Amino acid sequence: MITVTPGELATIDDALTDLLLERVFYWAEVRKASVHYKPLRGISDRHIHDLVRSIAACETGAAANLAVKKATNAFLELKEVRGYRGRLSPLAYEEFQRHTVRYLTIYKASCGFEINVSMRYKCRSNRGESCVISRVRYNRGDEIVGLSGCLAKMTKDEELALANDFSVLHSSRRGGNCLMLGPARFVNHDCSANARFVPVPSGMVIQAVKPINVGDEITVKYAENYFGRRNKECLCQTCEENSRGLYGSPQESSEEESDDDMDELTKIELQRRKKRQEQREGGTPELREGGRGSSESSRETSEEAIEISTSKNWPLIPKIESHTADSTPLPVPVGEVSEATVTEVSTVVPAQEAIPVNESTTALSQSSNEFQDPTIDPILNGASAEIRFPSLPSPDTTTSPESQVPPFIQPKSARRNHHYLGMHNTDERVRFNDRLSVLDERGGSEDMESCLVSGSESRDDSTAMSRDEESSRDDGDGSRSKRSKRHVRAQRKNSGSWSFSQEDLSFDRLCKAAREQAYDPSRYALTGVYGFSVSGATQTCVSCCSVYNLTDGPKTLGHFCPRCHRHAAIHSFAWPYTNHKHALPLCLLMMRPPKKLEDEDWGLSKPQVAQQFGAKNRKIFEEDGSLVQKKRKSLAWSWEYTKEEPAQEITSMRIEDMSPKELKKWSQAGRQTRSGRVSMLPEKPKRSRKSAPEPVEMRDNVAQLSREERAWKRARRGTVGHEKVEVNTPTVETPSTGTPKVKKLHWKQKLAMERRQKEAEAAEVAETRVADGVDASTPSPAGSTPTPRGRGRPRKSSREEEIPPEKTPEAKRPSPAATKTPSMSPKVKKEPLSMSFSMSPTSRSGRVRNPTEKALQLMEQGEYVI
């Protein structure tokens, strides 16, 4: 299969990680594969958010796939993206389309993982690295759908030209090293991984080899010697738990060095020392007991020796030998070690014969030349006669037995501290020691003072008194608060014990949180403390209960960590849920922590709402009005306890999430606050769930007209003068429950209906007059009212009201021409003279609008003579 070159693949991946990952509420910087990457300008984050949310809103697989396809097409049609893809080759453009689909697929609701930030590798890259966290449970053998990548085979020149080799794998199928990029590039290494790479024709997928729970990191094993020989530079969790890799002892790392750096004599010497060390492993516990003050155990172990480590990255450990049981072991020089980074350590001596450290070091330095052992490695000759090796400066240095034991036989926690100080330079360690040396894990000034008081077993009283006199003499000129830190640092370095001032004890309260937050390579925080903060401004996420930093970390909203905020902004649900099937209460983006609710206080879930109240209902009010469930634009279903204002709807809709129609509506009703939200929304009246039919109001024992009857009555208003014409309305059987729905007539249909009614009424009037002997063409009497064509009701004249129809005089005998039967006489319809002067059909009162129309009307009736 022909693929793109590694350079083109790196350029494509950098552009997509910048647009589709970093700009989608991501709070860290993604490492780029290409060194010369330039981000695309002019693309709004709002467009990217809309594309991602359109994919996350689809729950079913078919709808989500269609949404991914539409979002991909919309993304490729952006103006800036069109300009970028125009610079790609046809093969690279096809890979750009496939790569876009890979990155958009991770935002589907059915996707079981998400890309997060890990702080485990901060000591190596000085920033957080990306990782992959599981949102669902995977069993063994399950394929992690969506976590895929693309492979591009590399040549020798490309391997040398590629500066960042963080995603280079060896493929036996392709016959060489390949560059793998895509969502699968964020999977980190672990020596005991829970997944593995599976090659496919289109690239690479990942399959679970162990059960993966929710919240676990998805890891794979890169290779056996990927991080040096036997992965001795590995920082994974397995190496941390087993004290291997970079967490292992310096002696083990020195023995694993390559054979080319040492000659045969050195190899033989290392083998001998390793064999003797294995034989003396039983004496190590006794040596630790001797450090606690046991004279018998110290005499038994005084003849044993500890081998000297030949590691290049670790100070040499002294070889302790004692010629007699009562003599003090002789310290051995270590070499050139910085004065500011070391702590003096007293050797193991019996408790009855213990002497102060400053006196013992002075006596030992005077007699150091006498007790030189010629068998010691010549590299130690000519150095100072003090024993120093790096350790954390804590108040327990002189009393703790672990501080008197070489680091490779100390517990794992102590070795981590040694390794942490060894990775930083001298100035950083000095500042770190000055701040953390006065801290105690138990906390509090009282506990600290009790810990600082040492007994007669570890320190001489005269030495302590002289030290107090010196400190009081130094503080005589000024106050304690003005004492320089340089003097405190020198006093701690030159003395065998620690002395603390009141300033140090007050500083303990401030920096206790800093001690807990200090970075430790063994501390693995997926979404934990982001950075180091001396002030201790941290907060616990109310959703996932993780600790995050408010001052130095990313800016988040409310009480939620960056991971939960990003997940809620995309999927509108609390982490790790992505649909409404999980009935989980949401308190996202609220400015106060959630209150504890009882079981009877919970409302209904979304499926129950749709089942009982219809799918369009968005809120439920309890009978007592204590709990409100509402629908938001930015974050869907959320809960809040409101007993003070039970009937008031909570409003926290973001302005940028409103449509233009909604924004116009709410801007008229409320006001915009500084926080960018809309408040003072109008209250909507509460409507019952099932409204009963309203009772029919009775007027004079006559029921109100229905909607259909009122429509027919309006159509019947333009009738002839004072004669009522009964119109046969179609009988509609109305059901007993409720009012029937009548189809609303169009205005053209109403006009046509009125026209037909007028024609029928005119024909009936003509037939009636012919039957009574009155000519239809003769003008009507002077007092008669013309036939209106408007919608207004006809008015009866006073003459008609006074004279009943039976007392009217008989009309004259009609002429023979007019005595034709109605069937023989043709129906002639009079048309107006001009359409422009005709009466307007929209006239409701029946009156004419201007004198011209009045004159034309009188001319038609024969009353107006020119």
Curated annotation (Swiss-Prot):
Region annotation (Disordered) ranges: 243-310, 359-378, 383-416, 443-495, 661-853
Biased composition (Basic residues): 481-492
Catalysed transformations (reactions): L-lysyl(20)-[histone H4] + 3 S-adenosyl-L-methionine = N(6),N(6),N(6)-trimethyl-L-lysyl(20)-[histone H4] + 3 S-adenosyl-L-homocysteine + 3 H(+)
GO molecular function: histone H4K20 methyltransferase activity; histone H4K20 trimethyltransferase activity
Keywords: Chromatin regulator, Chromosome, Methyltransferase, Nucleus, S-adenosyl-L-methionine, Transferase
Biased composition (Low complexity): 390-403, 776-789, 834-845
Protein name listed in UniProt: Histone-lysine N-methyltransferase SET9
Species name: Yarrowia lipolytica (strain CLIB 122 / E 150) (Yeast)
